[in-house]
Amino acid sequence: MISWLDIYHVVSATVPLYVSMTLGFLSARHLKLFSPEQCAGINKFVAKFSIPLLSFQIISENNPFKMSPKLILSDILQKFLVVVVLAMVLRFWHPTGGRGGKLGWVITGLSISVLPNTLILGMPILSAIYGDEAASILEQIVVLQSLIWYTILLFLFELNAARALPSSGASLEHTGNDQEEANIEDEPKEEEDEEEVAIVRTRSVGTMKILLKAWRKLIINPNTYATLIGIIWATLHFRLGWNLPEMIDKSIHLLSDGGLGMAMFSLGLFMASQSSIIACGTKMAIITMLLKFVLGPALMIASAYCIRLKSTLFKVAILQAALPQGVVPFVFAKEYNLHPEIISTGVIFGMLIALPTTLAYYFLLDL
């Protein structure tokens, strides 16, 4: 059971994040220390340096040979289920005022519902409840986030950005359609069929170009290199006992240790540019909270039952899914300008209700 001392440790882990965010907000809104270009530069530094190095640090310090296959499968199944649910909802519900089309909303929903703040808030809260076993499980979940889900998230961001750019394939397809409509009465049936085949081929070529463009962007992203090198080094370290040279290790820690603080500072800078703290509006804020604290845990319960997780592993998997949204997806959303106002609202208010929400799920699991 959680004691008052444990609650103090949770608050101690949360308050510094709000301090960083508040400093960012005050420095931009009231002190006018940063221009919009400088704010964008700070966010880019976090996205291109701090987060990749933090990912490397987390992955390289985890033993890949002791990870739970059932936990990995359950985590993968949860992400798959949430994509299916979001895709089904978007077939019938078309949000207004958003960017990126349906793919953009799937990316945002995925960021909110199943990428929690496991490292900063999950460790103190769940370790207080379940001890060292919970810490070991959470370390594996953090590694999965950094190694798999952030990489996939970046690919989806790049794919969405590539789709938004005008392509020659799209222009050809549009021209072909206009000509077909103008001359439809004068063309024989065979020529119509040939043009339809040409249009389909043009669409296929356009899709391949978009995928290749997104892939090229992904493979030059620093986070891709950081995660790949991290898992290779973790394998060498835990199999052969190799250690990083001290100067390299300290250089990585120097930059990565401030990553989350800089991310929260960037969040504060973004808030300062908005007219309201609830930048996305009350309705969207409520939907965000439902995605985070209802849909995410519910789908983790379903996947945990399917994979047959048991005992502490089952409970920790569900409780970590009920943790508030992580700040890293906000950094990516701001970098790609895809609904950062929605994700920032999820981060801010999610951290405020983190402890009571987690305790509510804890008591439900003990019934």
Curated annotation (Swiss-Prot):
A Pfam family assignment: Mem_trans
Location of region: Disordered: 168-194
GO annotation terms (biological process): auxin export across the plasma membrane; auxin-activated signaling pathway; pollen development
Tissues and organs where the protein is expressed, per its UniProt entry: Expressed in veins of mature leaves. Strongly expressed in pollen.
Effect the entry attributes to changing Q78A: Abolished auxin (IAA) transport activity
Effect of Q145A: Abolished auxin (IAA) transport activity
pH dependence: Optimum pH is 6-7.4.
Outcome, altering K79 to A/Q: Abolished auxin (IAA) transport activity
Effect of Q320A: Enhanced auxin (IAA) transport activity
Effect after changing S146A: Normal auxin (IAA) transport activity
Topology relative to the membrane: Multi-pass membrane protein
Effect of I120Y: Strongly reduced auxin (IAA) transport activity
Phenotype of gene-disrupted mutants: No visible phenotype. Increased frequency of aborted and misshaped pollen grains and decreased pollen germination.
Regulation: Auxin efflux carrier activity is competitively inhibited by naptalamate (N-1-naphthylphthalamic acid, NPA).
Binding site residues for (indol-3-yl)acetate: I51, N117, L119, Y150, V327, V328
Family assignment from sequence similarity: Belongs to the auxin efflux carrier (TC 2.A.69.1) family.
Biological function: Acts as a component of the auxin efflux carrier. Component of the intracellular auxin-transport pathway in the male gametophyte. Involved in the regulation of auxin homeostasis in pollen. Involved in the efflux of auxin from the endoplasmic reticulum into the cytoplasm. Binds auxins including indole-3-acetic acid (IAA), naphthaleneacetic acid (NAA) and the herbicide 2,4-dichlorophenoxyacetic acid (2,4-D), but barely indole-3-butyric acid (IBA) and 2-phenylacetic acid (PAA). PIN5 and PIN8 may have an antagonistic/compensatory activity. Involved in the control of vein patterning.
Subunit structure, interactors included: Homodimer.
Name of the protein described by the UniProt record: Auxin efflux carrier component 8
